[in-house]
Swiss-Prot record:
Cofactor(s), by name: [4Fe-4S] cluster
Protein name: Probable dual-specificity RNA methyltransferase RlmN
Chemical reaction(s) catalysed: adenosine(2503) in 23S rRNA + 2 reduced [2Fe-2S]-[ferredoxin] + 2 S-adenosyl-L-methionine = 2-methyladenosine(2503) in 23S rRNA + 5'-deoxyadenosine + L-methionine + 2 oxidized [2Fe-2S]-[ferredoxin] + S-adenosyl-L-homocysteine; adenosine(37) in tRNA + 2 reduced [2Fe-2S]-[ferredoxin] + 2 S-adenosyl-L-methionine = 2-methyladenosine(37) in tRNA + 5'-deoxyadenosine + L-methionine + 2 oxidized [2Fe-2S]-[ferredoxin] + S-adenosyl-L-homocysteine
Major place of residence: cytoplasm
PANTHER family: 23S RRNA METHYLTRANSFERASE, RADICAL SAM CORE DOMAIN-CONTAINING PROTEIN
Miscellaneous information on this protein: Reaction proceeds by a ping-pong mechanism involving intermediate methylation of a conserved cysteine residue.
InterPro entries reported in the protein's UniProt record: Aldolase_TIM, Methyltransferase_A, RlmN_N, RNA_MTrfase_RlmN, rRNA_lsu_MTrfase_RlmN/Cfr, rSAM
Family: Belongs to the radical SAM superfamily. RlmN family.
Coiled-coil region(s): none
Originating organism: Deinococcus geothermalis (strain DSM 11300 / CIP 105573 / AG-3a)
Length: 344
């Protein structure tokens, strides 16, 4: 049976105002069954229920953090598992969604990378995370105004499904998100970055997980990094900016004694010269078996100071949800074996 959420809103069944009613039930009201769509004719509801399913998930569990963040563990219909994170702030509500079960990038400091790759998520399994989190938090779906593709997986390796999900998220009759509030994070795939730049109708923001300015360190941190050199990644980032006019964000996880040397801050500043960019320095979040430690606060500040003195727009991003295993780099800590197990 087809998952209704996989469809673009323009492809939804029914016609005219009945289609608009259906879209409102799904994306505005956030109902989970066709039977609850009481202003649709009974026959239409029965027909929909015979052709489509609304729920991508078999089970949903939550782990709540003291800071208000919530990790959602989703069991998909095939038994695989993946996670999303809800992060409430005073001025906004943000959701971090996954695009894959596991991840093939294998970043050494990231728990998701240690899982390996399970499979790509469908558009509906991506969008469904937003609807499920909204429901779990007692929110209307459109109250989640900020979204980052920064959960499990490499979005640019699940390109078509991620782009379809983004178009659903932005569609005015679906979730109606602002493109300025949606960010896609990639480990740095030049072909995918250039392809994203050509998506004229999207306009979502780009973040690149760089983590080192030199090849030797980056390949130690990201074992698959040898496939694309830093020079190739930076060239693609510059092309992206030339085409879109948008700022590029660079994510930099601070690993003690690995990528936090001041000479590396100097090299990073050199790499970014002439590019309108922002650098997020992220203290590494611990997980069992990682083999890495976060840089000290003093070293992070010193690294920051070098970048700032060189004119780099830089900030230190304090991760939320550490105590719930929901912070950056911690996703997949709960039952990773089940998450990447064989399909039922």
């Amino acid at each position: 049976m087809q998952l209704l959420l996989d469809l673009h809103p323009d492809q939804y069944p029914l016609e005219g105002f009945r289609q608009r009613q259906l879209l409102e039930w799904v994306f505005v009201q956030g109902v989970g069954t066709f039977e609850a769509m009481t202003n649709l004719p009974a026959q239409a509801r029965a027909d929909l229920a015979s052709r489509f399913r609304l729920n991508p998930f078999r089970e949903i569990e939550t782990v709540r953090s003291a800071d208000g963040s919530v990790k959602y563990l989703f069991t998909l219909q095939d038994g695989r598992q993946m996670e999303a994170v809800y992060m409430p702030y005073l001025d906004r509500k943000t959701i971090c969604v996954s695009t894959m079960v596991g991840c093939p990038a294998k970043c050494a400091f990231c728990a998701t990378g240690a899982m390996g790759f399970g499979r790509n998520l469908t558009p509906g399994e991506i969008v469904g995370q937003v609807l499920a989190v909204a429901g779990g938090e007692g929110l209307a779906p459109r109250e989640l105004r900020n979204l980052v593709f920064m959960g499990m997986g490499e979005p640019l390796l699940n390109y078509e499904n991620t782009m379809q999900a983004a178009r659903i998220l932005l569609h005015p009759q679906a979730l109606g998100m602002s493109k300025r509030r949606v960010t896609l994070s990639t480990v740095g795939l030049p072909k995918g970055i250039r392809r994203l730049a050509a998506e004229d109708d999207l306009g979502i923001k780009l973040a690149i997980s760089l983590h080192a300015p030199d090849e030797a360190t980056r390949q130690r941190i990201i074992p698959t990094g040898h496939r694309n050199s830093i020079a190739e990644i930076m060239a693609a980032a510059r092309e992206y900016q030339a085409v879109t006019g948008r700022r590029v964000t660079f994510e930099y996880s601070m690993l003690r004694g690995i990528n936090d040397h001041l000479w590396q801050a100097e090299e990073l500043a050199d790499l970014l010269r002439g590019l309108v960019s922002h650098v997020n320095l992220i203290p590494m979040n611990p997980w069992d078996g990682s083999g890495f430690e976060s840089s000290t606060e003093e070293q992070i500040q010193a690294f920051y100071d070098v970048l700032a003195a060189r004119g780099v727009d830089v900030s230190v991003r304090r991760s939320r949800g550490k105590d719930a295993g929901a912070a950056c780099g911690q996703l997949a800590l709960k039952r990773p074996a089940a998450a990447v197990g064989a399909s039922a």
